[in-house]
């Protein structure tokens, strides 16, 4: 099974700051997908097929990467972006998730 390692586990960013989090796969995958989860709510699909934004996701978000190295970037952190972000692969069975990166707002 492919193990996804997310880094950092926890991070904080001030409003307007650029944010980058990474997801490393133990074997090469074709695409990476990202989910956003806020406390007490179900995860929302956020970025799919590495770089495509799900409906309603602000353009300040982007995804990139290939093979074993992927990233999610926010060009300008906003308060509503504080959440936990999970990467996911389904290139190889079983489908697997990373442990998440918790993004906190620094005031």
Curated annotation (Swiss-Prot):
Region (Complementarity-determining-3): 88-96
Region Complementarity-determining-2: start-end pairs: 49-55
Region feature Framework-1, mapped onto this chain: 1-23
Disulfide topology: 23-87
Region Framework-2, annotated ranges: 34-48
Coiled coil regions in record: none
Domain of life, per lineage: Eukaryota
InterPro entries xrefs: Ig-like_dom, Ig-like_dom_sf, Ig-like_fold, Ig_sub, Ig_V-set, IgV_Light_Chain
Segments for region (Complementarity-determining-1): 24-33
Role this protein plays: Anti-2-phenyl oxazolone (PHOX) Antibody.
Protein name per Swiss-Prot or TrEMBL: Ig kappa chain V-VI region NQ2-17.4.1
